[in-house]
Design a protein with these regions (language model features):
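Nucleotide-activated chemistry modules centered on ATP-dependent adenylation/adenylyltransferase
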Residues: 1-171, 175-184
Length: 185
């Protein structure tokens, strides 16, 4: 079939095959940077300045430029919220902060590999590459898929993809994460 070249490629080739460019540099060609504050979501204290809110993603911890803050010890900071209108990047300390967690999400623009399930079903879901399977219950609300996780999941990010598998690992479909919730909020 001539798929040898494709099958020997690495699993992930960066953002949609843009090649060996630096991500920020690539985006800067299309979206000019607008600097803004990096704010601790718990204290509302400004910790630093970001290089442009579109260059960051929820759950990101590297490249923030806010390490070594006096009085914060060895805290690792993670992006937990982006206010695009106000150009504020919010961060939280440490792994498994409640600001990074969710227990349900809604998926839009779903593509099914076969027939759409007719009722609620158990599924395994991946929210990012190389992530462990997340057992969830898949149901429907209008045209959207509603996923309720069996356990809390960290940094499920609107705009990214969720991919659903059955318990045997068979691909069912996937779509775009629209919004996430923790305990209904």
């Amino acid at each position: 079939l001539g798929l040898d070249e494709v099958s020997s490629k690495h699993r992930s080739t960066g953002i949609c095959f843009i090649g060996e460019r630096h991500f920020r540099e690539f985006l800067h060609n299309y979206f000019p940077a607008k600097k803004g504050p990096i704010v601790d979501i718990e204290t509302n204290r400004v910790l630093g300045e970001h290089m442009g809110i579109l260059y960051y993603t929820l759950g990101q911890r590297k490249g923030l430029g806010i390490g070594g803050i006096k009085g914060e010890g060895d805290a690792t900071w993670f992006i937990c919220k982006k206010d695009v209108e106000k150009n504020i990047l919010y961060v939280t300390k440490g792994d498994f902060s409640s600001y990074l967690m969710s227990d349900e999400c809604f998926i839009s623009d779903v593509n099914w590999i076969g027939k759409r399930p007719e009722k609620e079903i158990p599924v395994q879901v991946k929210f990012r590459d190389r992530q462990k399977d997340n057992p969830c219950t898949l149901s429907f609300e209008g045209d959207e898929v509603h996923l309720r996780y069996n356990e809390l999941v960290e940094a499920v990010t609107p705009g990214q993809f969720a991919v659903f598998y059955d318990d045997d690992g068979l691909l069912l479909g996937g779509g775009i994460i629209d919004r996430t919730f923790l305990k209904g909020r």
